[in-house]
Amino acid sequence: RKEGDSVNRTILHSDCNCFYASVELLHHPELRGKPVAVGGAPEARHGIVLTADYTAKRYGVKTGMALWQAKQVCPDITFLPPRMDLYLRFSRMAQEIYADYTDKREPYGIDESWLDVTDSATLKGDGFHIAQEISSRMKKELGITVSVGVSFNKIFAKLGSDYKKPDAITTMYEDEFQRKAWCLPVSDLLYVGNATNKKLYSMGIRTIGDLAKSDETLLVRKLGKMGSILWAFANGYDESPVKLENTLAPVKSVGNSTTTPRDMETDEDVKIVLYILAESVAARLRENGFRCRTVEINVRDKELFHFSKQVKLQNASNITKEIAEAGYRLYKDNYRLPADDKELKSSRPEFFQKPLRSIGIRGTDLVTDYFWEQLDMFMDPQAREKQMKMDETVDIIRKRFGFYSVQRGLMYRDIILSACDAKSDHTVHPHGYFG
């Protein structure tokens, strides 16, 4: 870095504490002080903990834990179903508060944001004072608490917000980050996941300070380019700007996946679920003015074996049938019964040896609706136009009368597997840090 480039910046990272659970407790005050988690219905096998409140966390309940596991470690826990529309509304209200201090705001998921308040000091005060104001307003106006990190770059601002929770403000200024951050486990640094942590551990690197003092060349040899990036982060060399909200990286793919209420045991089961998911993917592509040129599926069986496969489409598409059929062909071509299990095949030829537990489908390699390409000479343009108009009509009907107002006949073959509105249930995931 050039000396002084990032020293003069003031970056905040604001993290809403136990966000989903905190919002729910505003609507369920009778549950305050009791263990609460937000997740899917416990009777549905795919339910996991999305957020737990601090009372539940003290019992050992963690984000990502299966609901049945959470119930084991905390028998008195109360599960609440997620309400994404409600959380998104609170997220937007939080952004409105942040907007009073800067236009340089970069959301990191639904409950976190970086703020560059460098230019706000004259009117609003220094970074610590702004963090205090934001913390106070979030409590008074939204009823939730935040942890805020104040630093000279994004990496240490994020580390500061993680440093102490809940309802805390932590500074990580240039003259103090070595004292505060270098003693922390290296896994606390952004982008040090489990696999990277194991590699660093094998190199004798336990803390952020160990990483900072390591040989950068050796790190690159072991971790590739990421080794150099992490070494720079540990030493405070991060000049990445806080992106304006409307300049974040464009959508690169649109997908949906699900763990079904019961195992998928036949080809028809898989086809039903793929069509449900493809309807959501295609509808969201149309809403955003995109078509996909590649379809990818992800499949996991009951023993958690999984594979991913993709195929290039003849023509870019946002048509449900084309996306679903491409995904179904990928599944048929790549999921096979073991050849040696003749007895099982003869007794139950229509069943898999290992039923499927979850499946996902994704449209990638996106182009805009006005992207021009030569249509395949063997394709029937009138039939394709008919499919497009049918999809658009279904969009209109569902928008007015609800998802279940019009359904494909295929869905009525299994009401358990088809009881899913994948588009409405879709969760928006965080933007990648590197764009």
Task: List the predicted regions and their residue ranges.
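Acidic, metal-coordinating catalytic segment for phosphate/diphosphate chemistry
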Residues: N315-G435
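DNA-contacting surface of Y-family translesion DNA polymerases
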Residues: H13, D188, T196-Q353
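Short, charged/polar surface micro-motifs in flexible loops or helix N-caps
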Residues: F19, P42-R45, K302-F305, L366-D369
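A residue-level signal for beta-strand positions that form part of recognition/binding surfaces
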Residues: I11, P35, D76, V251, ...
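Gly/Gly-Pro- and Ser/Thr-rich, intrinsically disordered tail segments characteristic of DNA damage-repair
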Residues: R1-N235, V242-E245, A283, P381-G435
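A short glycine-rich, hydrophobically flanked beta-strand micro-motif that places a catalytic Asp/Glu
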Residues: V146, V150, R293-E296, I359
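Short, hydrophobic beta-strand segments
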Residues: S113-D119, S308-V311, T368, E373-M379
